[in-house]
């Protein structure tokens, strides 16, 4: 059977063989991406153009080309999840240290005086720009291999405030880190978050009950986890 027979992520040792003709390679890549899972992908080929094409299209956290799929070496081989396989840093943790910050206090000094409609919210997300890929950096190769580390921006991040000033501050922080920010223009209704497309995360600095409703709505989404970010920038970190 083919890739579509895999209904969930399975940790081995399990070997699933799916044969295909060479002209079907594009369909195979699409089928793999459609599963939503993508922890590690391995490719064995001598064709440089095929390596380049597949590496750019496959949605996986780690890509091994012509090498053993072994555990990553911290500081040399970055290792992180993707999509339904998780997005945590795992063994790539040392590269995340400069993003750590202390959790701030809830900001209840601002609020929205109107509600942002679902139509306006959906339209704003659909027209948001796509995040840019940062230039590759190269890590030490213990056995002479090439270890490239790439970083990609999340899908658009919704800056929900509360209030115009808070939303603008959130958007500036997202943009400064290379992300794509979408500023709310009114109070977001929690139920609208469940089916909202192109959503990478939601930033909310307001009251706890609203944050709880946002959390529940995001948890009800299908596909990869979309985080609710309530921490505020800390100048001391």
Task: Enumerate the language-model features and the residues they cover.
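Conserved C-terminal structural/oligomerization subdomain of aldehyde/semialdehyde dehydrogenase
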Residues: 1-237
